[in-house]
Regions:
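Domain-level signal for soluble alpha/beta catalytic cores
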Residues: 1-371
Length: 371
């Protein structure tokens, strides 16, 4: 495995469409109709089949497709000590659709011991071979901080943590614990998924936030510092990357806007080796902000949408790669879908066959561009 370094010329973000029988099994478990052991057996079988398909598609990365999760972010948060699962009276309001209502609440000191995702990773790790590496995706620490202050959640958060600095330090330490445990389990590739930066790009979001007397610079500095604290003392051979997301629920989106507002903060100063960036439509803006990416970092261009079954034209994607290469050398660019195919259990509006066709297209284009 020492010859593998993410990102790869053709890559993907992590989540895959759940098979219908897996969705049914999870519903049956919630209804008390099957046991936890029976659900885990069905999950294991579905993940094993997914990894076979990932390998057959020729991709060097294997994941569990986030098949054991309901949400891309909340399940990880619920696995931390001091955090509990709550249901709000409404979900996130995406473009034309409302999400389900799950959220988090602080109940005590936050820590990361014995996180269930470590065992989840071990199951994937066993399928690694000389051609593949197992990746673990987790929500960024900044995402947890944002969720803890989402609407009324902040009241409980401040009741438990009146000192914001103590909260930041505990979140960072919890993440360092999980990262070390994943590393000890054999993980060498961890991807932060982070919607906080996507929201910073959105003008409407920031106009709404002005009532809190919060500046973008202050919030960006706080989130960046937290993410970097969580990455302190990470092993040198652990590849750490960030996927910046604008929301991906049932083929809808949450935020719009180019990367210009966040680029000077994030692209130059986050202590990761690569960014997976959404560039699948006009909502993402142009490639000009890539000029802020520091010379030691790589960029995975999310030019192929995971929200639609329509296959992009190869030549259009190649021309867009060439445009991006005006700001970052081609040898530091890579290609992927813009996001996962099922950031939440409901999944996007395409079939499994259409999902694999998207990944085949990404691979074909990458091989034609980079050889």
């Amino acid at each position: 495995m020492e010859n593998f370094n993410a990102p790869f010329r053709f890559d993907y973000v992590g989540s895959f469409l759940r098979p219908e029988h897996l969705k049914q099994a999870r519903a049956d478990f919630e209804a008390g109709q099957i046991t936890k052991a029976e659900l885990e057996s069905i999950e294991n079988e579905a993940i094993t089949d997914l990894i076979k398909k990932q390998k057959a598609a020729g991709y060097p990365v294997i994941t569990d497709g986030e098949f054991r999760r309901s949400y891309w972010h909340l399940d990880f948060m619920w696995g931390l000590e001091g955090i509990e699962h709550i249901e709000l009276d409404h979900g996130y309001f995406f473009h034309g659709e409302e999400t389900t209502h799950g959220s988090v609440r602080v109940t005590g000191k936050i820590s990361g011991e014995q996180h269930p995702f470590v065992e989840h990773f071990k199951f994937v790790k066993q399928f690694e071979d000389e051609h593949t590496i197992a990746r673990q995706t987790i929500p960024a620490p900044a995402q947890l901080l944002a969720e803890l202050f989402r609407e009324d959640n902040g009241t409980q958060t401040l009741a438990v943590y009146p000192d914001l600095e103590e909260l930041i330090q505990d979140i960072a330490q919890a993440y360092r614990t999980v990262i070390r445990d994943l590393y000890d389990a054999g993980c060498r590739n961890i991807q932060f998924d982070d919607c906080t930066w996507g929201m910073f790009c959105d003008k409407n979001y920031w106009e709404a936030r002005q009532k809190d007397f919060v500046s973008l610079e202050e919030e960006a500095a706080k989130y960046l510092r937290l993410n970097n604290l969580a990455l302190e003392n990470a092993p040198e051979d652990l590849v750490l990357t960030t996927h910046v997301c604008r929301g991906n629920y049932h083929s809808t989106w949450a935020s719009s806007g180019g990367y210009e507002p966040i680029a000077p903060f994030l692209f130059a100063n986050e202590n990761v080796s690569a960014y997976y960036l959404e560039f699948d439509d006009e909502r993402s803006g142009g490639f000009e902000p890539l000029r802020f990416v520091s010379d030691d970092k790589k960029v995975v261009l999310g030019l192929v949408t995971s929200k639609s079954l329509i296959l992009e034209e190869k030549e259009v994607i190649k021309k867009r790669i060439a445009k991006a290469a005006k700001y970052i050398p081609l040898n530091r660019l890579y290609l992927s879908p813009q996001c996962g195919f099922a950031s939440c259990e409901i999944g996007n509006k395409l079939t499994e066959e259409e999902q694999w066709a998207k990944l085949a297209l990404v691979k074909e284009i990458a091989q034609e561009v980079w050889g």
